[in-house]
Amino acid sequence: MEGADLLTAGVLFLFAAVAAVPLAARLGIGAVLGYLLAGIAIGPWGLGFISDVDEILHFSELGVVFLMFIIGLELNPSRLWQLRRSIFGVGAAQVLLSAAVLAGLLMLADFLWQAAVVGGIGLAMSSTAMALQLMREKGMNRSESGQLGFSVLLFQDLAVIPALALVPLLAGSVDEHFDWFKVAMKVLAFAVMLIGGRYLLRPVFRFIAASGVREVFTAATLLLVLSAALFMDALGLSMALGTFIAGVLLAESEYRHELENAIDPFKGLLLGLFFISVGMSLNLGVLYTHLLWVAASVVILVVIKMLTLYLLARLYGIRSSERMQFASVLSQGGEFAFVLFSTASSQRLFQGDQMALLLVTVTLSMMTTPLLMKGIDKWLSRRLNGPEENDEKPWVEDDKPQVIVVGFGRFGQVIARLLMANKMRITVLERDIGAVNLMRKYGYKVYYGDATQVELLRSAGAEAAESIVITCNEPEDTMKLVALCQQHFPHLHILARARGRVEAHELLQAGVTQFSRETFSSALELGRKTLVSLGMHPHQAQRAQLHFRRLDMRMLRELIPEHSDMVQISRAREARRELEEIFQREMQQERRQLDGWDEFE
């Protein structure tokens, strides 16, 4: 693709995303389906703006590559070892069972047995990009079902290597003299990558970080990700697997969060490009001429994979309320099918339109997943939020809560327990089904679902409540919920959790004055105890803590992001001098006073 054509394509992609995704969000069908529909619209079977789909699809796989790098950063080697049972147990069982059943059905549909085996393996794979995106949107990444889903996806990425090696064997085109030397060199190169990454990456990033130039750090991160992807591709392995390993090697480094922040914007854009490319690849001509065959194959594919995944989730011990989410989020075909089927086609395993039919089936199955997840969410919401005959009667006296608590993680649990201990009427909103089930067992009123949905807030009693406490893990969810409450429930007193100073500034700018930084209070308390351990009187240490809190909050309100760096630095130095003067006066006053109270727990 020429430079001018590439620029035009980039503009079209951005326009399609900007136009389609907000519309999809407004319709409640999710961003992923919006990207897919945008791809259909601008692709060769839509308005025809772009015709070179294969090249763009290959480039857009970088979105999956960046996503796997970030996932690797969140998993250290010890955590990965803990998942070995689910990766090689449940993951292997899912691929083998699904592939066997689907291959049998393809043979009944007049596929050669060799083509049926390749087709069954390809259809058994799920979309890593789509599944992980949906799991994050639904809050599944913290749940047991989300961890199991990730394990299955990781095994599927590992299965890419033997699956591609199987194609020439099935086609009968393998060389009589197997090149063991070439295989040994690939294994050696892979080992060098692991050992070199283990001992060289951290010193290299330490050297780069010492320069103090953020752009260089971002460039080094991009260089690492793209180099790992190209290296694995040259070895004939999965690019996503290479960047995942690079992420795992850096998971315990001090640069983990900075690496994640540097990559995140590129990951989001390239993932969007990937989904648009998948939509562009949908062959509407084949769909039109084989409509019944394709429709039946999509339904059969989704049903078989859901049944297999549901059965494995049950055997693994996943809660019944989480099994449907787990089964549906992995029910689609995946991006690996495009690679495997193209390789098989080059070996002449498929006849006629067989490859096109399989690719259309995979693409349409990917489009069904967001709709399927939305339907299951509604079903779970009715099941969990509706009254049941066997439910214990909650201790709340009526259906009008005083406080709505959003989120029942570690932060939200402490708040909810304190409120309940003081007989406050509360309603908890939570996206984690396991937490919902636990709360309902104890008789507390709890709603399952996404708190950023207005109807859920209404059914939870937002119109009658006095306050809402927002403890979301994601800052984006917090700000979205703040805007929603200010628009639809302006009477609510909003209290929120802030992860740090940046989120605190965003809350202040949105008009939220009551918030708590999650580590600030505990750090102050530990600092107070440290002062006492160094010989300071408990009463004096408490006053020092209060002065520090008051001055820090004043600095937080004054040092808003609109000010330049020099203004912020100047005010920070001034505040530090003021704090030292206050402490000096306090120490002189304490010497003239009698002792106050002693240390307490």
From Swiss-Prot:
Coiled coil: none
Primary location class: membrane
Membrane topology qualifier: Multi-pass membrane protein
Listed Gene3D superfamilies: 1.20.1530.20, NAD(P)-binding Rossmann-like Domain
Keywords: Antiport, Cell inner membrane, Cell membrane, Ion transport, Membrane, Potassium, Potassium transport, Transmembrane, Transmembrane helix, Transport
Listed GO CC annotations: plasma membrane
All residue ranges annotated as the RCK N-terminal domain in the record: 400-519
Top-rank taxon, per record: Bacteria
Transmembrane segments: 4-24, 29-49, 55-75, 87-107, 111-131, 152-172, 177-197, 207-227, 230-250, 262-282, 284-304, 324-344, 356-376
PROSITE patterns registered for this protein in UniProt: RCK_N
Gene Ontology terms describing biological process: proton transmembrane transport
Classification via SUPFAM superfamilies: NAD(P)-binding Rossmann-fold domains
Subcellular location: Cell inner membrane
A Pfam family that the UniProt record links to this protein: Na_H_Exchanger
GO MF terms, alphabetically ordered: glutathione-regulated potassium exporter activity
InterPro entries according to UniProt: Cation/H_exchanger_TM, K/H_exchanger, K_H_efflux_KefB, K_uptake_TrkA, Na+/solute_symporter_sf, NAD(P)-bd_dom_sf, RCK_N
Subunit annotation: Interacts with the regulatory subunit KefG.
Record-linked HAMAP family: K_H_efflux_KefB
Biological role: Pore-forming subunit of a potassium efflux system that confers protection against electrophiles. Catalyzes K(+)/H(+) antiport.
Family under the similarity heading: Belongs to the monovalent cation:proton antiporter 2 (CPA2) transporter (TC 2.A.37) family. KefB subfamily.
Cross-referenced PANTHER family: K(+) EFFLUX ANTIPORTER 3, CHLOROPLASTIC
Name listed for the protein in its UniProt record: Glutathione-regulated potassium-efflux system protein KefB
Organism in which the protein naturally occurs: Salmonella heidelberg (strain SL476)
